[in-house]
Regions:
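Beta-lactam-recognizing serine transpeptidase/beta-lactamase-like catalytic domain environment
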Residues: 2-6, 12, 74, 118, ...
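Periplasmic/cell-envelope proteins involved in peptidoglycan metabolism and beta-lactam response
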Residues: 1-305, 327, 349, 402-412, ...
């Protein structure tokens, strides 16, 4: 039996057990409270915030693109999209009809859209209608009680100052598709998001990571139905959660001169083709136009299927940049290369002559000259000036195709020149190895005769053609063409600058340079030249015309008038050269598709670019040209007073001849073209 002491001890043990249990329970409760409120307090607080806060992305405005003289070529315009966030869209039966009425959509189209995205996370917004009007924005914002879960997202759309005049050069932006997101994230190591816009061509694509900026975000306080109540400032939030300011993209200053660009664009009105002007002394692209074009702004405001279908089904391929992505037979503009190769290799000299009777026979096969009655006795100078085919057929029998390949590639043809723009093509300069690998056939001599006049397999881009003539003008210095001068911040700080880069340099014989340059001068400026129709008062060019066959004609059709042919079978017209003719500054290349003749079709476009350039940068030189219009090429060479003034828009020390013919050395220009230091001798 238990005694009284035993009974007391039992009660004490029970009390201690109960107390220990109570203490343990409190300890567990306190531990749990510590775990929830201290250890994971931040996490659970953030969960609670998600119920009353909405994180809105603040899109970073894209950087601006300027011309070389700081003319704004692109700008940003706000665009508004109506979106539904399913997490807060709790009254669809009531809201959808009202929303459809405001947005002028059918209720069924909204329901189908929501059904399409019902598998994605409910907090992700769904765009119901892009680019809504300001009236629609006002209704959705002021009557938000009627539209729970519906909000307005602001985007920045892109507009282009000159429309399609620079469409291929500047490019366009459009929304990244869901399929491309993973690939782009991997390629660029950048956290692209659904709804992001990205450059898809031209400068917009090539420099997208510079231009795009960095998005921020802003927290909004919302009610239980997802309606925005107020912006939340950083001081309102728990430690570790903060608003982020969007950082605008960097700005781009191009090498393009807008006036020369527009001159080329308007000169190509009603024509399909390409035009380019390059600074001979740096490789900077002054103008770059491809037609037909497209409206780049439409891509950033929500491209309609009809417009996209029109673009991709158009047989003229308006999306293709003909300057760098298309290649053409250069025709007679290539004869200059053949002449240089023959002179440099000693195959001919300045005294070599050919009697042109209008055709040349290789075995039993006739090769016709463009001039049916022939040119008579022709030397290398006249062969360029008057574009005699028979002269070059004769050279073709003496020249190995690999020699032609050597010089063409030396001048940058048949290869990518490395311009920093997407999808540059190589063109084609054939040789024996190429034909054997491609066709498993030996090279034939008759093929060389076609190649030396820029036909058959020979294909070049307008960019390569301009670079070739720039290299002639600089007497052997091939620059890498580029379209961007610098990248700079909104404060004006230059972050990157692009300097001239010489791909390679070589020296030509003086006799070669003298013959070729005089012939190119006389093509435009003296009677008998194939481009004398483009001689302009105060606008002095040197260059070469070309006609590129689209298809071969039979012997009885070869001399038929080109304009009488069906349009798609007409020859392309080309002009390539440089300006001014003496002490040149820019090289020019123009292709007019199915233009028939280089002089009448392409020549006026080149002349328009040369005129815009000389009028703007060398007004004094233009006056001298007008005064000295009767001078011959040798007289101009000897008259140093005709050396052009330096480009007034650039900085740097230069040497030039003043109006009195005195050599001025180390003339320093600032942006306002004021002399800082000058001396003469």
């Amino acid at each position: 039996m238990f005694g009284e002491d035993d009974l007391v001890r039992v009660h004490q043990d029970r009390s201690e057990l109960i107390l220990n249990i109570i203490v343990a329970c409190f300890a567990i409760l306190l531990a749990r409270l510590w775990y929830l409120q201290i250890y994971h307090g931040k996490m659970f607080f953030n969960y609670s915030l998600e119920n009353r806060l909405r994180k809105d992305v603040v899109r970073a405005p894209r950087g601006m693109i300027f011309s070389r003289n700081n003319v704004l070529l692109t700008h940003n315009v706000p665009r508004f999209d109506a979106v539904i966030t399913p997490q807060y869209f709790d009254s669809p039966d009531d809201t959808i009809p009202a929303l459809a009425e405001v947005l002028e959509l059918s209720p069924d189209s909204i329901r189908k859209l929501l059904k399409k995205f019902q598998g994605q996370a409910k907090y992700l917004p769904i765009v119901v209608k892009k680019n809504i009007s300001r009236r629609e924005v006002a209704i959705l914002e002021t009557e938000s009680n009627r539209f729970p879960g519906v909000s307005v997202d602001t985007f920045i759309s892109r507009e282009y100052t000159d429309g399609d005049a620079g469409a291929h050069l500047l490019g366009y932006i459009s929304e990244i598709s869901q399929e491309k997101l993973p690939k782009l994230r991997e390629r660029d190591k950048y956290d692209y998001k659904q709804g992001d816009f990205i450059g898809q061509s031209g400068v917009e694509q090539q420099y997208d990571l510079d231009i795009r900026g960095e998005d921020g975000y802003q927290f909004m306080e919302v009610d239980a139905r997802g309606r925005a109540r107020r912006h939340v400032t950083s001081g309102d939030l728990y430690t570790g959660i903060d608003n982020k300011i969007a950082n605008p993209g960097k700005n781009i200053r191009l090498t393009i001169d807008r006036d020369v660009q527009l001159a080329a664009y308007h000169a190509l009105d009603g024509k399909d083709g390409a035009a380019i002007a390059i600074d001979i002394e740096s490789g900077e692209v002054i103008a770059m136009v491809s037609r037909p074009g497209f409206d780049p702004a439409k891509f950033s405001t929500g491209l309609t299927s009809n417009y996209w279908g029109t673009l991709i089904m158009d047989e003229k391929h308006p999306l293709r940049d003909r300057v760098i992505q298309e290649h053409y037979s250069p025709g007679s503009t290539f004869k200059t290369l053949t002449a240089i190769a023959a002179l440099e290799e000693g195959i001919i000299d300045e005294n070599f002559k050919v009697n042109c009777t209008g055709k040349y026979h290789l075995g039993a096969r006739p090769f016709h000259c463009w001039k049916k009655e022939g040119h008579g006795a022709v030397d290398v100078y006249r062969s360029i000036k008057e574009s005699c085919d028979v002269f070059y057929y004769t050279i073709g029998t003496k020249m190995d195709i690999d020699i032609l390949y050597k010089y063409a590639t030396l001048f940058g043809m048949g290869q990518r020149l490395g311009i920093a723009l997407p999808r540059e093509t190589t063109g084609l300069i054939p040789n024996k190895d190429w034909k054997m690998k491609r066709m498993k056939q030996e090279w034939q001599k008759g093929e060389t005769l076609s190649c030396v006049i820029g036909q058959s397999f020979v294909n070049v881009t307008p960019l390569q053609l301009a670079s070739f003539y720039a290299t002639i003008a600089s007497e052997g210095k091939l620059y890498r063409p580029h379209v961007v001068k610098e990248v700079f911040s909104n404060t004006g700080e230059v972050l990157k600058s692009y300097k001239p880069e010489v791909i390679h340099q070589f020296k030509l014989k003086k006799t070669t340079v003298d013959i070729v340059k005089q012939a190119l001068f006389d093509v435009v400026n003296t009677p008998g030249g194939t481009a004398t129709s483009q001689k302009g008062v105060g606008i002095q060019m040197a260059g070469k015309t070309g006609t590129a066959q689209v298809m071969s004609f039979s012997a009885h059709n070869i001399f038929n008038k080109c304009e009488n042919q069906e349009y798609k079978y007409r020859h392309h017209g080309l002009f390539a050269g440089y300006a001014p003719a003496i002490n040149p500054k820019i090289a020019l290349a123009v292709v007019v598709e199915h233009g028939c003749h280089g002089s009448s079709a392409a020549g006026p476009v080149a002349k328009a670019m040369a005129a815009a350039f000389i009028n703007k940068y060398y007004p004094t030189y233009q006056k001298r040209l007008i005064a000295q219009d009767k001078m011959t090429y040798p007289q101009i060479i000897d008259d140093n007073r005709l050396n052009p003034d330096p480009m007034i828009m650039e900085k740097g020390e230069v040497n030039y001849y003043n109006d009195e013919g005195v050599l001025v050395k180390n003339f320093f220009l600032d942006k306002n073209a004021q002399a800082v230091n000058a001396g003469g001798e």
